[in-house]
């Protein structure tokens, strides 16, 4: 009998603890930040694979990242970082038109976003719009950052 009562008390405490946890919102991601972080990690891994010329494996990771980032975007449409990586993943999977849309949307939120300006510039180089790429470079001018250096080098190669 004592064992049954102990079990019932344990069960009641467990249920209350679980309800309190759920009610507090702990473990829930209302902003999409964990989806964003997962997507960003996948992109970082994919970039490393790309450097090793493992293009198909990289593309698979970009597609997985895209899935996470689209879900993050559904939860937080005003986050320039999400828009940056969403545009990046789309560009890397060949959807330049949609990538450009998200980059431009991100610039409306943060016109000086270093990543968006660099990656949008790269998109413009990839789509033979060098004048527009140079505009992005001009925005980055003076930042003394790798984004400027990388975009400048890419423009000079083309």
Name each model feature, range by range.
Residues 92, 126-127, 157-158:
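Register position in tetratricopeptide repeats
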Residues 75, 109, 140-143:
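Structural marker of alpha-solenoid helical repeat scaffolds
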Residues 79, 113, 145-148:
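Residue-level recognition of tetratricopeptide repeat
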